[in-house]
Amino acid sequence: MASGKPVLGICLGMQMLGLRSEEGVSDGLGYIPFSMRRFRLDDYPELKVPHMGWDRVEIVQRDAALVQGLEQPSRFYFVHSYYAVCEDERDVLMGCDYGVRFAAAIHRGNVWGVQFHPEKSHRFGLQLLTSFSRG
């Protein structure tokens, strides 16, 4: 990370960028201060865990390089049981609602993370990965 080269964590890769998770006792890498929490959707019987399938995301930081060219709202493919809660809202790049509002994508400095799977997300994912590769 110190080299300044861009880093992109996808799904579990994003989760590892944070501080901690309710899932286990090991700390995360701590590159971005956030925690992972398990979905507790007792008040939403129509919603299942894991959160699986296509969902809309809201781009919060429109000027960030990673989201250039993306439609608003965009749709991405998710498969996860834990969601990110950032300590600093300025680290939230994209948000999503699934019983709770969570950070679907995060960014700080040269470190980027996405909870969804861009490689499974058709034109939206292709645009995001293209933007990342162009820096």
Regions inferred by a protein language model and the residue ranges of each:
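Amide-donor transfer/coupling interface in amidating biosynthetic enzymes
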Residues: 2, 35-135
